[in-house]
Amino acid sequence: MTEIWNFINTGSKNPYYNMAMDEALLNFVSRGEIDPVIRFYTWNPATLSIGYFQRLQKEIDIDKVKEKGYGLVRRQTGGRGVLHDKELTYSVIVPESHPNMPSTVTEAYKIISQGLLEGFKNLGFETYFAIPRSKEERDKLKQPRSSVCFDAPSWYELVVEGRKIAGSAQTRQKGVILQHGSILQDIDIDDLFDMFKFKNERLKAKMKENFVQKAVAINDISNQHITLNEMENAFEAGFKKGLNIDFKPLELTEKQLEEVQELEDKYRSEAWMYRK
């Protein structure tokens, strides 16, 4: 029998709301208020998000972020910097105790990413899972060369034509798995790299060249322009098939929405942003 999960598309929201909603959904699942949930969303303004452990002032050119009019937010998940602009962002929130969820992060990535794999199939792309096979490849993941996400695929992230097309991060808190990630529609590589600090211009140019070889957006390889709506439809169906689930629409209570608002204040605060 097909399991029924919640589905919510919160549309285009500010970065603090986006991170607050993901954390709030984790809380609601942890407390048993709602069933597992898949969420889609986009960003307004376009935003640079940094990982929980990244050192903001050392790695990010904050003035450049402001100059370009981008938002800036710290995620509750690890990983590196991501420019959320022309993309579909997804989150999956499910109890660690769920019978289909493995106990290890990498294996849970694989299960959840089946939904992404099927979504790309629906758009006509033959994607596959990245599996770092050599010790050198695994060591590179432990010590990334840059602060920019998408410059190398991690375990079970999606790759097409040898380049990473979706980047995800996962955290486990309060007995719940939260995995969220970016499915790139288009990407502005120059803007992305301008917002990070590098030791010198030569290194920046080398990292940018490496990035172009390692990352790709949907419309870079599609024969026709794929819209956000087409992506939403493809990945909604993809998650249903990949996880063998069906959806019911999620409607939050007034009390739950108040919790989202309280968490939004947390993500907006300098104490959170400058915590590292």
UniProtKB/Swiss-Prot annotation:
Pathway(s): Protein modification; protein lipoylation via endogenous pathway; protein N(6)-(lipoyl)lysine from octanoyl-[acyl-carrier-protein]
The BPL/LPL catalytic domain, residue ranges: 32-247
UniProt GO molecular function: lipoyl(octanoyl) transferase activity
Catalysed reactions listed for this entry: octanoyl-[ACP] + L-lysyl-[protein] = N(6)-octanoyl-L-lysyl-[protein] + holo-[ACP] + H(+)
EC top class named in words: transferase
Gene Ontology biological-process annotations: lipoate biosynthetic process; protein modification process
PANTHER family the UniProt entry points to: OCTANOYL-[GCVH]:PROTEIN N-OCTANOYLTRANSFERASE (PTHR43679:SF2), OCTANOYLTRANSFERASE LIPM-RELATED (PTHR43679)
Subunit description: Monomer.
Name listed for the protein in its UniProt record: Octanoyltransferase LipM
Lineage summary: Bacteria, Bacillati, Bacillota, Bacilli, Bacillales
Gene name tied to this protein: lipM
